[in-house]
């Protein structure tokens, strides 16, 4: 038996994250990366001190009232906490954490990717290439919209 706190990681995370967790915790992994039903989540929580869930695991009041006293923290691998009944967890004495602002830069980068792709017709060009339909060029072909000087 380990002296380390027991941690349930509910979804498959990167190998580096799982290895780091295993260094400091007695880790229980979801190797199949399957979404737990509410009852499965409760069953898995019975023998752990901490849970590292994603937004896909719902900690509703019905689930929270059945959580064991030994569970002390839900350390979310997500920005939001809308999947957690914070009032019920607070009443139970379970600390809830999240990762605020962790996705802000990535979201902005994806917004630029989508805007440039739409302006320059990247998706349409990709489909043409894959279908073998890109067999000519002309000065007006697939020009798209120039973004220089545009305001968002």
How should these model regions be labeled?
Residues 8, 151-152:
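Conserved hydrophobic beta-strands of the Rossmann-like cofactor-binding core
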Residues 100-151:
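Phosphate-binding beta-alpha-beta segment of Rossmann-like dinucleotide-binding domains, i.e.
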